[in-house]
Amino acid sequence: MAEKFSLSKFFGMNDEYDDDYAEEPTPATKSTPTPPTRPNDSRKVVAMRTAKPNASHIAICEPRIYSDAKSIAKQLTNGDAVIVNFARVDEAQAQRIVDFLNGTAYAVGGEIKRIGEQIFLCTPHNFEVSGDVAANLGTQVTR
């Protein structure tokens, strides 16, 4: 009678267990590994660059159309000061933008100041501005 074909016999593997192999007994209790200890070093490590949580930010904007006032107002409501240069808009548009920013500054408890012929500084409540540049706009310094 013909012997039954088996893949394990074809590849030389025996179906019987190898008696030489013995399983290692498993320990009943496992020991938890201890973390490696560092040598006691008295020096302190300090980061050179630290983040400033209360860092102030001043943005500079030059609006060209009235709809640019929305992005300026968003920066103001986010707590950033904004310097606005109205050199590229006509006088009527500039007046509308200043009126809008006046309302925004009032809403956030801030203020708006003229610091140049066509330049305004809009600040939220957490900025303090000292000095008055607008009083000196009409006078020129001659040497």
Swiss-Prot record:
Key words, A-Z: Cell cycle, Cell division, Cytoplasm, Septation
Renumbered residue ranges of the record's region Disordered: 16-43
Domain of life, per lineage: Bacteria
Gene Ontology cellular component annotations, sorted alphabetically: cytoplasm
Primary localization: cytoplasm
Location(s), subcellular: Cytoplasm
GO process terms (BP): division septum assembly; FtsZ-dependent cytokinesis
A Pfam entry, by short name: SepF
Function of the protein: Cell division protein that is part of the divisome complex and is recruited early to the Z-ring. Probably stimulates Z-ring formation, perhaps through the cross-linking of FtsZ protofilaments. Its function overlaps with FtsA.
Subunit structure: Homodimer. Interacts with FtsZ.
Family listed: Belongs to the SepF family.
Protein name per Swiss-Prot or TrEMBL: Cell division protein SepF
